[in-house]
Amino acid sequence: MSQQRGIQNTENRGSKNKGEKLRTILDDSTKTIYGMNTSKYMSKDNFLLGDTAFITLDSSLTNIEKVSPDEKNQFTYQSLGNIGTPINNIFNYYPSTFSISSGINSLNYYYLVSSEAKFYDTKSPYIDLSLFFGGNGRSMVDFVFSRNINKNWNIGFDIHRISADKQISASKAKGDKNINSSLFKLFVYHKSEDEKLTLYSDFVSFRHQILGNGGVDVDSDSLPLNFFTYNDFSTRLKDIENLERRKRLNLFLNYKIIEGLEIYNDFYFKTQQVEYMDENYVENAPYYNDFFLSNISTLDSIKIKSVVNRAGVRGLLGDIKYNFYANYKNLNYLYTDNLNANIFNEIYLGGIINFSRKEFDILADFKLKTTGDYSLLGKLKSKVFEISYYSGLHVPTLFQSSYSGNHFQWDNEYNSSFINTLEAKVKINTNSIMLSPFIRLSSIKDYIYLSNEKNPTQHDEILINNQFGVNLNLNLFNKIINLESRYSYNTVSKSSADIFNIPKHHIYSRLFYNGKWFNNSIPVQFGVNAYLRSEYYGNAYEPSLQAYYVQNNFLLERNLRLNLFYAMQVKNLRVFLKMTHFSQFDKFDGYFVTPYYPAQKKVLDLGIKWYFFN
């Protein structure tokens, strides 16, 4: 009996083991592995250009240490020395949009980059989490969630946060806020079963608060400063606040009629509200020249609403992608002291034609308004060279035409600005060297800018700005040692000398080690980012207008900035450490990035980027 029980138990255990093995085989064979290759996205802009390929998630360590807009753009932007502060493109003075706009755009970067429309196809639930913990009370959070309900529907949301303490004249060691910014986006994407209908919709809410101080109180005649005391600096203003709110509702529909012929409609409803508040009249009054509405306190605001609808036809004829459309925009705005809103209506026709072959790519993009204003862009691209030409007549922005606040008021009738730009570059590639000389020749007539008096001015002469430079990339020892660099030399015409204030020399370099440690399982990068520019009279910032203006008194000294970094990756987790402004060897040393606003002093920063699947 005992033998039989033993045999029976053995048989039972054998059956059990066989069952477990069978289950394991079934589990391993049926289990789907979700990861980098199963979660993809496509931008709506690329979709409209006919590029319908989904993009795999970025898992590279390259440039992961760059957080602020000026760092990400090789310091071709200026800011107020802190993350989340208003920014200005140093080298590009031309309107970024053809359609009439508010013109209050110093915070555009934080809104546009985070609210970009993307079509996600993630298969499984997907999370993209980015955390930045900067020294001196600076932090950023980017959270993206997306999941496929089924193979045809995807939903998700984004949350983006920026928080930063004051870096100069802080009233306490921690928590004296300079920046509070948040953006929330809810989106849905649908592709029908027969792949004829594409639907995308999103809702975006953006709030950006700046608790400013007008910069440090120094006389331009006392420059350069020998000591940067940061928290002990006196400031030009106290307890002022800028607050900008934006909302956006977008509904996009695309329908394929037949192969090569599709129709679409893209609808937007947008709001923008900008406020400037200063209730500290006693201390701040000497800063202002005029008081038009109140000599006790300032509460300026502008409210803008716009409805935009674009209807078009797009498709593919052989090697030619085409997109022809009509664009309608209704815009109304209201200032603090206005009882009735001002209304604008705008209509223009546009088209994009792209002829693509393996050897080269030709693109033509044109827009024409009923007023005669136009935009024309042509590009020719091959493996060896690229050349582009742009010509356009751009109407003044609302801000340039009309403004009503407590400290500034104007009502202008300006001509459209006439812009011409020619760009070209050559690419020379070998196994270890990429050399790419480039040139940009630009001219603009009837240029509109904020003058030193902080009022719009239109210059009727032709202004010329030319840029010559070279991009150089090197990789040595089987791509273990790498160098990425860019140098530009900038010139302006005599008529532009006090209007286009740009550094004559500008250099960016990234020298880094790239390899794998711990039995080739952990990718690692470490190195230095270097930025060098020559001295120039950089544009200054006016808080009450939330805008940059031309000035010719405050000289920004030549400076070299070095950021040391170390980055590593463990599966879906990437981490970096960065010593920002490592080249500040003396704690009282420093420089100005914008008149009256010092650069970030030396701090240690930590960043994390983590993907989660299923």
Kindly label every feature range from the protein language model.
Residues 29, 51-52, 59, 101, ...:
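Coil residues (strongly favoring Ser/Thr
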Residues 37-47, 52, 59, 130-134, ...:
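Outer-membrane beta-barrel proteins
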Residues 71-83, 93-114:
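Flexible, glycine/serine/threonine-rich loop segments and coil->beta-strand junctions
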Residues 109-111, 120-129, 133-167, 179-184:
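Outer-membrane beta-barrel translocator/receptor signature
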Residues 122-124, 244-280, 296-614:
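Exposed, low-structure sequence patches enriched in small/polar residues
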Residues 164, 171, 177, 189, ...:
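Flexible loop and strand-edge segments within Gram-negative outer membrane beta-barrel domains
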